[in-house]
From Swiss-Prot:
TM region positions: none
SUPFAM superfamilies: P-loop containing nucleoside triphosphate hydrolases
The protein's name: Energy-coupling factor transporter ATP-binding protein EcfA1
Domain ABC transporter: 11-245
Membrane topology: Peripheral membrane protein
Gene name for this UniProt entry: ecfA1
SMART domains: AAA
NCBIfam families: ECF_ATPase_1, PRK13648.1
Matches recorded under InterPro entries: AAA+_ATPase (IPR003593), ABC_transporter-like_ATP-bd (IPR003439), ABC_transporter-like_CS (IPR017871), ABC_transpr_CbiO/EcfA_su (IPR015856), ECF_ABC_transporter_ATP-bd (IPR050095), EcfA_1 (IPR030947), P-loop_NTPase (IPR027417)
CDD domains membership: ABC_cobalt_CbiO_domain1
Binding positions (ATP): G45, H46, N47, G48, S49, G50, K51, S52
Length: 274
């Protein structure tokens, strides 16, 4: 991040509007948001709320119809696009669509080869990252022999290999089974706690959003709420407008007599065992 101004947001959107060429209304309508450096922000919303459009605008994949986007204090435009995209890594919903290499090792190596990293250094990076995501025993494995969760972990390792300052997780758990989802969320949590990255999670999953430092809620292309995850998720009006479900633990706790509603699994178990 630039040292010129430590208060500069890592990402800033100013009055951003976006309309698809085939659309009749704005997918994003006058959205202004700041993303602090080093924080984990979850963006919640139903299908069609504009959250995935937002992620693609931040990544420079879509150009706003109007409004401005700044990455690390620099305006995102044609002349700065390539430089700023090097600061951003994005992991998409379908793990099959982003596996480029013939094997796990090849996939992690792909971006490093493009950056002309020396082979010896590359080997060390691949081994280190594959261990961190729990895939070091599968380096010679082909993608068709991996589960969805394993493929997403490889995708995360491939992004980490490029060492971007910003990582966007775009519905990364929506196509995974419960085991795969748990593995990926654990990995995101580890990145949040141990790496100085600005993380953005695009999701409709409240169990994922509750891990974040901050939650933004979109509905019909507009920002309708922003704040602490627990406060946002307790706001039934916001939840209803956004058409999203409360986390499983919270729903269970609300059904139990003499138990205060909670999002904390350990706290719920403690209340039940009293």
């Amino acid at each position: 991040m630039s040292t010129d101004n430590i208060n500069t947001p890592m990402i800033e959107l100013k009055n951003v509007k976006f309309k698809y060429s085939t659309g009749t209304s704005f997918a994003l309508n006058d959205v202004s948001i700041n993303f602090p450096q080093g924080k984990y922000t979850a963006i919640l919303g139903h299908n069609g709320s504009g959250k995935s459009t937002l992620s693609k605008i931040i990544a420079g994949l879509y150009k706003p119809t109007s409004g401005d986007v700044y990455i690390d204090g620099i305006k995102l435009q044609r002349s700065t696009l390539r430089k700023l995209q090097e600061k951003i890594g994005i992991i998409f919903q379908n793990p099959d669509n982003q596996f480029i290499g013939a094997t796990v090792e090849d996939d992690i190596a792909f971006g490093l080869e493009n950056k002309l990293i020396p082979r010896n250094e590359m080997k060390k990076i691949i081994l280190d990252l594959s261990k961190r995501v729990g895939m070091d025993k599968y380096l010679d494995r082909e993608p068709q022999y991996l589960s969805g969760g394993q493929k997403q972990r490889v995708a995360i390792a491939s992004i980490l290999a490029l060492d971007p300052e910003i990582i966007i997780f775009d519905e990364v758990t929506s196509m995974l089974d419960p085991k795969g989802k748990k593995e990926v969320l654990k990995l995101i949590r580890e990145i949040q706690q141990t790496r100085k990255k600005t993380l953005i999670s695009i999701t409709h999953d409240m169990d994922e959003a509750i891990l974040a430092d901050r939650v933004l809620v979109l509905a019909e292309g507009e920002l309708i709420a922003s704040g602490d995850p627990l406060e946002i998720l307790k706001n039934e009006r916001v939840i209803e407008i956004a058409k999203i479900d409360s986390p499983f633990i919270y729903r269970v706790s609300k059904l139990l007599k003499n138990v205060d509603p909670t999002y904390d699994q350990d706290k719920l178990i403690g209340e039940i065992c009293k």
